Design a protein with these regions (language model features):
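Bacterial Sec-dependent N-terminal signal peptides
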Residues: 1-31, 550
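Short loop/turn motifs that connect adjacent beta-strands in outer-membrane beta-barrel proteins
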Residues: 21-30, 66-70, 103-107, 111, ...
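Outer membrane beta-barrel
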Residues: 65-160, 186-188, 268-289
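Short glycine/proline- and aromatic-enriched beta-strand/turn motifs that initiate or cap beta-hairpins
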Residues: 25-49, 354-356
Length: 550
């Protein structure tokens, strides 16, 4: 444990020392960032918290990049010794997980090594990293971008990162985006801006299956359309994938397809957005045997709001790429200042509704089960909903600045959560109501107190929860006490005893460096970002996070 604390301290000092070295090698510059997350574990049988043999776990990275005119080189050293609980155990180890060379000018941009890339909305190709989820599916290969006035083209050949190795699949892709206004002179000055895009991605993987004849080359293509005029915008993308028998679809030979559409309007004091999506057998990976986080090539986002409040985010929706239909609507309206309803500074009303459901599936014939291995799987009517509801979330939030010192917001949320679909275990679905009050009091310059009161009411799962947080901020320093209480549940699928989860956290920020320490209990739960989720086990102990940039 002492060695790990010294290691974190050493890297912190190294980063602070490098900040003075921003001009090197003939006018080039060095920039980077560093983060270390350490957690000490104590056994707590009351909440199901285990003690790990190492007593302490550390996740850390140091990322550096050197730039000189059109040249750039970078690397990221990573350490998981061992990974913090909740991260995949295959992350255990340390080394350079990311490195690249890059050259760019006005027309050409060439990268060799690791890179992240996204075509369109990402339905058929998206490489990205979420450090707090333990997710990284970066590409390792060559990428070339060519830019003209009206047209930009991207091509790549690469493999995907799979923890400390590379996945078995070879990825080839090309994407093009055309600005119609720049391409056609007659509409060059039009207030209506139109963009068109096309993408194609192919995965090659050797077929070694002794039973089925699996396609070695699997292609997917997508087209997109975007229109902007004033405060109005419309976006739509459609994608299709040829038959791709894989571990996530039970090795069926059905083709996949997906569509996403968004329409929005905004002006002063008013904003509205409506999003729709449908995906059918569209889980696309660079390895046909991969499941979970592994080798994800395409990305189908969850059509739901990503909540920041703890209890509102208790039951997050996990995107179902192989079959879902969903929508999300958001309306934001600000009542005028100096009116009876708006108050002195105006009042903001934020209303959001999201819904996700299964797609309709029909057997291909009387003798074949839906989704049977080695078959075409099923047929599906495009506009027909299935009989299984996955999720819904209705929430409304009112926010008002009372005066220069006080700011208040209240929120109500109603939620339905399908346990089998979202968490994979057979338990009653959750019907929940969440009520939140949030108060900020700025009593002196650079001094404020922030109080949150939250309550979650449900008869299912662990029963009712409540939480109070009191936070003090003073120019670079903050401290917070969080008291989360599970009221227990003796009417659910299992008996849950009441329990208190206290947590104290302190933090200090100096320029671009932030240090945060905490001690207490954390509940078992699910953490999601954009519909990508990981399970987090219960824990009791000390946490330390250091992050900095230079």
């Amino acid at each position: 444990m002492i060695r790990k604390i010294l290691f974190v301290a050493f890297l912190s000092i190294l980063v602070l020392g490098l900040k003075a070295q921003n001009n090197v090698l003939g006018g080039g510059e060095v920039h980077g960032s560093f983060q270390a997350d350490a957690q000490h574990y104590q056994k707590d049988s009351a909440i199901g918290a285990d003690e790990i043999p190492e007593k302490m776990a550390v996740n850390a990275f140091l990322e550096m990049r050197y730039t000189n005119k059109g040249f750039e080189a970078g690397m990221r050293y990573e350490l998981f010794m061992p990974p913090i609980q909740g991260y995949d155990s295959r992350w255990k180890g340390n080394g350079f997980g990311y490195r690249y060379l890059r050259y760019s000018n006005e027309r050409v941009d060439v990268t060799a090594g690791n890179f992240y890339e996204q075509f369109g909305s990402g339905m058929i190709l998206r490489g990205y990293q979420e450090w707090n989820l333990g997710f990284d599916n970066s590409f390792d290969g060559v990428r070339v971008k060519y830019k003209m006035k009206a047209l930009s083209i991207t091509g790549l050949v690469a493999k995907q990162r799979l923890y400390w190795e590379l996945g078995p699949g070879l990825v080839r892709g090309v994407d093009g985006q055309l600005s119609l206004n720049d391409f056609i002179r007659k509409i060059n000055s039009s207030k209506t801006r139109v963009f068109l895009g096309l993408s194609f991605v192919s995965r090659y993987q050797v077929d070694q299956n002794p039973i089925y004849n699996l396609p070695e080359n699997v292609g997917a293509y997508a087209g997109r359309f975007q229109l902007f005029r004033g405060g109005f915008n419309f976006k739509m993308e459609m994608a299709k994938k040829i038959n791709d028998p894989n571990a996530t679809n039970n090795f069926i030979y059905k083709e996949g397809n997906a569509v996403m559409a968004e329409i929005g309007y905004s002006q002063k004091g008013l904003g509205f957005t409506l999003q729709l999506n449908r995906s059918d057998n569209m889980d696309f990976r660079s390895s046909r045997t991969a499941t979970g986080f592994d080798s994800q090539l395409g990305y189908i986002p969850a059509m739901t709001r990503q909540h920041a409040y703890t209890l509102a985010a208790f039951y997050p929706y996990a995107s179902q790429a192989n079959g879902q239909m969903g929508l999300q609507a958001t309306l934001i309206y600000k009542l005028k200042k100096k009116t009876a309803l708006g108050g002195r500074y105006g009042t903001s009303i934020d209303i959001n509704y999201s819904f996700s459901n299964s797609i309709y599936k029909n057997a291909i014939n009387d003798s074949t089960l839906i989704g049977q291995t080695g078959t075409l799987g099923y047929t599906s009517a495009f506009f027909k909903l299935g009989d299984q509801k996955y999720y819904h979330d209705f929430n409304i939030r009112l926010s008002r600045k009372l005066n220069r010192k006080w700011q208040l917001s209240i929120m109500y949320m109603n939620q339905y959560y399908n346990m089998v679909i979202n968490e994979g275990h057979n338990a009653p679905d959750v019907f929940a109501d969440v009520i939140i009050g949030d108060v900020w009091w700025k009593f002196k310059p650079y001094n404020s107190i922030h109080v949150e009161l939250q309550g979650l009411i449900t008869k299912q799962d662990d029963g009712n929860w409540s939480q109070i947080m009191v936070e003090y901020n003073r120019k670079g320093f903050f401290g917070a006490v969080i008291m989360m209480y599970n009221h227990g549940n003796d009417k659910g699928h299992e008996i849950i005893e009441p329990h208190l989860y206290p947590f104290l956290t302190l933090g200090y920020t100096h320029k671009t460096t932030r240090i945060t320490a905490g001690y207490g209990k954390q509940r078992e739960g699910i953490v999601c970002v954009g519909g990508v989720c990981r399970a987090v086990p219960a824990s009791n102990g000390f946490t330390l996070t250091v992050n900095s940039s230079f």
